[in-house]
Amino acid sequence: MKKVPVGLTAVVIAVLVLFGCSKGYEKKTVAGDLAITLSVDRYPLVKGDNMLSVKVADASGKSVTDAAVSVRYFMPAMPGMAPMDFNTQAVLKGDQYAFSANVPMEGGWKAEVSVVRPGKPAATARFNIDAR
């Protein structure tokens, strides 16, 4: 019976761990008086359903939980291809707003997160995200 060198086994395990587990994605931007953070557990996104979340915080860092959060995610038109454009409402879960994005193809996508609070001006944050 052949023995597999320990070093080779360690390299194979390291490669499987590094490439088998997708890293998350988190990007924070400021829109008006709000800090809006888009989070993805699995990044890059995959073709099909993806779960994302949005955290909205005011200038003092307190979570905003009384807003209506809508998300537009889209791929701009390219030569020979029409644009793809989708809209969804995020649902409050704890102190974050969650939504599902069904991405039909790989490539560069854009997301616009719009936050509307009672008695306050609307705020929109823009993000670039990739799908593979």
Name every feature range the model reports, one short phrase each.
Residues 1-19:
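Sec-dependent bacterial lipoprotein signal peptides
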Residues 21-132:
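Contiguous segments within soluble domain cores/interaction surfaces
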